[in-house]
């Protein structure tokens, strides 16, 4: 009862101030038999003198902010209720958008192509009819391995029209990682972009991928005019096949009251191991799109610049979803270009732009151009913008609002910076503590395990500005609290913490070190566990270590992330223990060449360690595990231990180069574009 009324548990540390205030009024009236007015005055003075002034200050400073958040939550709730009541499919929602916006209006700008809503609808109808002809049915899975283009959106949109879920494969993957992603979902078929043909064939040639159907699509020749025609200028199998099917709408799917039906799968690096397939349901997709719209005030008239890869949730859901569900025009690119970013925004008259932290740094590194301030972008939203460049980005490019948000693809932890608060990734209300149950708990930095109360066995909440592990309560009946997790149930289980605030409760473990100030603003500090983030991608250290082991044989090695001044995230670094062996310069060079070959052949560019430290020994824990905390403190400084040799992967020569004092200074001073 208490939790339902006040949004927190009886034993939680922070009782609601409003509850205490009302209780004091009741007590005074009962004991002193005073009038209600006198009781209120005395209670208020008592309340303020006992520390209530702090709550009053918080209330005054955050009331309007929290109203914005409440409005956003209410709009999301209304959309969820509407979905539950109407039982609409995702294709129903898009059809409504087409009718509302008009089939002749522009949906997508892509290089020299212009796709209208009608053309996108017709193309997706062709996809749906062809998949149905091939025997695909509701619940089947299709994989997409292609670069961003309008056909990419049309294919997975068409798949949803016949109830087929689509797995969006990271185009940077190769060999083992790519093979794992393909096998994870037990898909019936895959559509491969012509530009990625060779990468796919290296995996398909030597492995049984158990795929019934494989198509090659020509992204450049999947033109808007082919949406209605029966001809094609491409020789690729997918383009030819679509030319032979009609563009009429497929037979509508039966409407079912299942908001958790799988819509797409987004591959993401978890805390350990290979990339995992995160489940994106119709409900989850809607929550992310609606949440972004109302968090940052995106209008239907806005033209959104979305240069992010469409296999990412930021680009493929938060950006593309505004077009599919609300009729916004979007601008996409096959590859991000820092030099063309603002030129594109000017050309297409964009008013909203998306970013990840790396993008903002790349833009600041560009020469000053007139287009820097000739655009009409009023909102830039995304995640990962460092506080160190936040103000510089806003001032140079005259962007009035930064919409920073936080939330992993698979998580139920989604917060947003709605009021342009410098450096914050979002906030939770302190007026109604527990209304949106995201907390920061104390954690053992070495073991990464929660610190628990020795008496109750429950977790301990952090004080304001104290770093800790961000967790969010899981609830099966609350759309905001649902955790769909991964296709692999064991991987999902690893993201759950039990007995946090009460016995038997379930909480999502974000894997991120955060802190929260007294007003409820949250700030990202670092990643926990065996991952680090580089170039906007999560890198699994265990995956890199497996590749490293193939190169170093019986030697012991480990991988971790290190910070480089002036860059976002952490760059990869490998440490290898020679264990008493003394290598000649030629032997050392050969070892580095083998490592470089393995990294280049088996890892995407963002996962390849920039640094290698050759040392005599690695510190072990009491359980005979490598102490990454100890070795990571050394960073890539060659002076800390003169017996170690530190190497840097030179981005120009693509070989590992010995780090001396001059090279160390150059790296720290930003001489290299990393």
Language-model region placement:
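Gly/Ser/Thr-rich phosphate-binding loop
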Residues: 325, 347-356, 364-445, 482, ...
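Conserved C-terminal "lid"/linker of ANL adenylate-forming enzymes
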Residues: 558-563, 573-575, 594-674
């Amino acid at each position: 009862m208490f939790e339902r009324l006040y949004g927190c548990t009886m034993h939680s540390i922070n009782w609601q101030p409003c509850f205490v205030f009302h209780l004091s009024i009741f007590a005074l009236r009962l004991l002193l038999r005073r009038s209600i007015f006198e009781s209120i005055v005395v209670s208020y003075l008592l309340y303020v003198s006992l520390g209530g002034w702090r709550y009053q200050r918080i209330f005054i400073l955050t009331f309007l902010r929290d109203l914005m958040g409440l409005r956003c939550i209410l709009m999301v709730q209304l959309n969820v209720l509407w979905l539950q009541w109407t039982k609409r499919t995702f294709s129903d929602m898009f059809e409504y958008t087409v009718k509302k916006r008009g089939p002749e209006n522009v949906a997508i700008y892509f290089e020299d192509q212009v796709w209208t809503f009608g053309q996108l609808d017709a193309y997706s109808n062709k996809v749906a009819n062809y998949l149905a002809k091939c025997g695909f049915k509701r619940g089947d899975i299709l994989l997409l391995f292609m670069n961003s283009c309008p056909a990419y959106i049309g294919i997975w949109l068409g798949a949803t029209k016949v109830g087929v879920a689509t797995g969006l494969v990271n185009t940077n993957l190769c060999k083992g990682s790519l093979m794992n992603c393909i096998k994870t979902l037990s898909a019936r078929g895959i559509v491969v972009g012509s530009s990625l043909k060779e990468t796919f064939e290296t995996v398909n040639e030597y492995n049984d991928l158990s795929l019934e159907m494989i198509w090659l699509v020509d992204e450049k020749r999947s033109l808007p005019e082919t949406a209605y025609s029966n001809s094609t200028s491409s020789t690729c199998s997918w383009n030819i096949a679509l030319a032979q099917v009609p563009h009429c709408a497929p037979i509508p799917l039966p409407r079912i009251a299942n908001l958790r039906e799988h819509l797409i799968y987004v591959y993401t690096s978890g805390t350990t191991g290979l990339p995992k397939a995160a489940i994106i349901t119709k409900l989850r997709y809607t929550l992310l799109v609606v949440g972004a719209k109302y968090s940052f005030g995106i209008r239907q008239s806005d033209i959104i610049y979305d240069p992010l890869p469409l296999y990412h949730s930021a680009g493929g859901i938060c950006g593309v979803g505004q077009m599919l569900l609300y009729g916004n025009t979007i601008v996409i690119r096959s590859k991000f270009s820092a030099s063309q970013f603002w030129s594109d925004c000017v050309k297409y008259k964009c008013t909203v732009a998306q970013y990840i932290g790396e993008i903002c740094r790349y833009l600041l590194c560009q020469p000053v151009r007139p287009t820097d301030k000739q655009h009409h972008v009023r909102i830039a939203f995304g995640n990962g913008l460092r506080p160190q460049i936040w103000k510089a980005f806003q001032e140079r490019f005259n962007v009035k609002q930064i919409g920073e948000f936080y939330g992993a693809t698979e998580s139920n932890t989604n917060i947003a910076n709605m009021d342009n608060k410098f450096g914050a990734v979002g906030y939770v209300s302190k007026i109604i503590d527990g209304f949106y149950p995201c907390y920061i708990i104390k954690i053992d930095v070495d073991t990464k395990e929660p610190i628990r109360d020795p008496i109750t066995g429950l977790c301990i909440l952090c004080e304001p500005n104290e770093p800790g592990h961000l967790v969010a309560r899981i609830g099966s009946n609350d759309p905001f609290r649902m955790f769909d997790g991964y296709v692999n149930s064991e991987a999902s289980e690893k993201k759950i913490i039990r007995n946090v605030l009460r016995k038997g409760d379930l909480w999502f473990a974000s894997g991120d070190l955060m802190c929260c100030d007294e007003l409820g603003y949250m700030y990202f500090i670092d990643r926990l566990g065996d991952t680090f983030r580089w170039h906007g991608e999560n890198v699994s250290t265990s995956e890199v270590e497996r590749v490293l082991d193939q190169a170093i044989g019986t030697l012991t090695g480990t991988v971790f992330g290190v910070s480089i001044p002036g860059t976002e995230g952490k760059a990869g670094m490998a440490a290898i223990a020679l264990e008493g062996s003394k290598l000649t310069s030629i032997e050392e060079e050969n070892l580095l060449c083998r490592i470089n070959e393995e990294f280049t052949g088996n890892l995407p560019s963002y996962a390849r360690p920039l640094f290698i430290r050759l040392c005599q020994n690695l510190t072990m824990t009491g359980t005979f595990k490598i102490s990454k905390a100890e070795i990571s403190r050394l960073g890539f400084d060659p002076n800390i231990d003169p017996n170690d040799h530190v190497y840097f992967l030179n981005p120009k020569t693509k070989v590992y180069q010995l780090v001396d004092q001059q090279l160390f200074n150059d790296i720290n001073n930003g001489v290299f574009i990393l």
